[in-house]
């Protein structure tokens, strides 16, 4: 396909147009009085949401060059979502503000490479300051506040997540399910999560989320490589008769056996998914044994004289539900408390006996996975559209609370970044000069953008509020829900430090990339063939068109 190549200012302006479109559509959702966005779906009902990264993923523009700008800023939202699970709208607003200010300077003749250096140095300084000002989370009240803000000021959700964390511990797993009633409920079950996903994406049952969800499956656990499908045939035939799904957790599954499983899955002969076992060597075997205890099955290992070809249904484990995505697997089992408790006691004993801090840490991880269990939040809503929106908000809230436990909390509502603006200016004036100083000033000017947007979405004058907040103590900010200046921590308006940090770093990274762009190569838009004209009357045509 022929390409279009554009240079210099023209290239940067085209990117900017795409960035403007995406940033505006995402920014309307920011803050307690942010609005919703409706996404048209080719199939099914439209989706009404308030989640920055989901909106960003939906936007595709006709102009390929502008679409490149959209893709760049979408990356800032996606990376923030991957790192912290929340703060995607803030990252988008920050990146947009930095790009706008930066392009003005580049157009005026500033050197983009030196500007980028200034932006990077300013960001590094700010990351240190965010960590300096973060407070560790000490009680479930602070966890509830974090969840409440991330869920769009829903106190019930915040409290529910705090309760879930109390029950499963900081190491435990909190997962979401669609509930059957109108109310959102919390249920804590035994379960385990480990960091290995499906071997092939063809095992996914939900192609939109790229997840495999199997209800009441059999679980085949083995510490050997499965090379030949013949080894599996006897057990597969037994399972096919029951009509239940199967999850295979093995050291590895080689091409021939994997291809056979995938074909059976796609043809609907057997609902199957395969996962590589976590860990290495003896630790892998120990983790597989943990899973066997949890699921009330046996580990099929030649050390115990068991072979795959002789496996029977009573050797397989069972679970209530297994959820597998690209990176993780969550097993929810039930009704095996005695055996799990005995296994936990055994691990605790090993922890007391070992001197190695590394072994202790790994045993602690295993214990948390076995004992922690899984908290399941069953999302309730009146309609499917509301259910999807609630689920996204809850996902953000869970991620935000986990991020808060990791790196602590800072004043929310854009307050932290706004207060860091004059601190950065003072530092930059002393430590940077020339165009690097201009780069730092670009970041400094952008730091108030999230606060201004939150205020504007609440119907206030953003610029005035940002200036007022800068003059107040570090903890004081603007509560957009009530329109008052308050102590943010006391009012429960807090953000996880990790979310603020990730958003800032990803925004600065994307802004630096856009500013240093000098040329864009993109596909030429395809010419649409105009339809052939119909036969005019009196032209002697035999057919009516």
UniProtKB/Swiss-Prot annotation:
EC assignment: 5.6.1.7
GO-annotated biological processes: protein refolding
GO cellular component: cytoplasm
Primary subcellular site in the record, as a coarse category: cytoplasm
CDD domains: GroEL (cd03344)
Pfam families according to UniProt: Cpn60_TCP1
Family per similarity comment: Belongs to the chaperonin (HSP60) family.
Quaternary structure note: Forms a cylinder of 14 subunits composed of two heptameric rings stacked back-to-back. Interacts with the co-chaperonin GroES.
Name of this chain's protein: Chaperonin GroEL 2
Native species: Prochlorococcus marinus (strain AS9601)
């Amino acid at each position: 396909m022929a390409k279009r190549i554009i240079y210099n200012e023209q290239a940067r302006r085209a990117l900017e147009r795409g960035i403007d479109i995406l940033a505006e559509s995402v920014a309307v959702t920011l803050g307690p009085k942010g609005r919703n966005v409706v996404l048209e779906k080719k199939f099914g009902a439209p989706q009404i949401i308030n989640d920055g990264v989901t909106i960003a993923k939906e936007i595709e523009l006709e102009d390929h060059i502008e679409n490149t700008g959209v893709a760049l800023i979408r990356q800032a939202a996606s990376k923030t979502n991957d790192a912290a699970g929340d703060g995607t709208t803030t990252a988008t607003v920050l990146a947009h503000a930095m790009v706008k200010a930066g392009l003005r300077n580049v157009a005026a003749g500033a050197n983009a490479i030196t500007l980028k250096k200034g932006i990077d140095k300013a960001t590094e300084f700010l990351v240190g300051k965010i960590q300096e000002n973060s407070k560790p989370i000490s009680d479930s009240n602070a966890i509830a506040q974090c969840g409440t803000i991330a869920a769009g000021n829903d106190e019930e959700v915040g409290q529910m997540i705090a309760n879930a964390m109390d029950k499963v511990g900081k190491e435990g797993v909190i997962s979401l399910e669609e509930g059957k009633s109108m109310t959102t409920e919390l249920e804590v079950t035994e379960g385990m999560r480990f960091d290995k996903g499906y071997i092939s994406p063809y095992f996914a049952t939900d192609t939109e989320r790229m997840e495999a969800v199997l209800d009441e499956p059999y679980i085949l656990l083995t510490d050997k490589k499965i090379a030949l499908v013949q080894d599996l045939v006897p057990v597969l035939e037994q399972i096919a008769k029951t009509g239940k799904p199967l999850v295979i957790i093995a050291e590895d599954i080689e091409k021939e056996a994997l291809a056979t499983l995938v074909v059976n899955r796609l043809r609907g002969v057997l609902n199957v998914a395969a996962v590589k076992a976590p860990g290495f060597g003896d630790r892998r075997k120990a983790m597989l044994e943990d899973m066997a205890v949890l699921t009330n099955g046996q580990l099929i290992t030649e050390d115990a004289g068991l072979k795959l070809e002789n496996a029977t249904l009573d050797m397989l484990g069972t679970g209530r539900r297994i959820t597998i995505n690209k990176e993780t697997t969550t097993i929810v089992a039930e009704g095996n408390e005695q055996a799990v408790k005995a296994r936990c006691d055994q691990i605790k004993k090993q922890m007391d006996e070992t001197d190695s801090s590394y072994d202790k840490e790994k045993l602690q991880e295993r214990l948390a996975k076995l004992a922690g269990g899984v908290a399941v939040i069953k999302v309730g809503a009146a309609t499917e559209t509301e259910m999807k929106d609630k689920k996204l908000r809850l996902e953000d809230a869970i991620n935000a609370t986990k991020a808060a436990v990791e790196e602590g909390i800072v004043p929310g509502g854009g307050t932290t970044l706004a207060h860091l603006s004059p601190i950065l200016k003072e530092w930059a004036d002393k430590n940077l000069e020339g165009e690097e100083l201009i780069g730092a000033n670009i970041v400094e000017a952008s730091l108030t953008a999230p606060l201004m947007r939150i205020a504007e979405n609440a119907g206030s004058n953003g610029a005035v509020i940002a200036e007022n907040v800068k003059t107040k103590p570090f903890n004081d900010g603007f509560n957009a829900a009530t329109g008052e200046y308050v102590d943010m921590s006391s009012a429960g308006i807090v953000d996880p430090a990790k979310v603020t940090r990730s958003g800032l770093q990803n925004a600065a990274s994307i802004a630096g990339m856009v500013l240093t762009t000098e040329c864009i190569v993109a596909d030429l838009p395809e010419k649409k063939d105009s339809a052939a004209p119909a036969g005019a009357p009196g032209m002697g045509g035999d057919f009516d068109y």
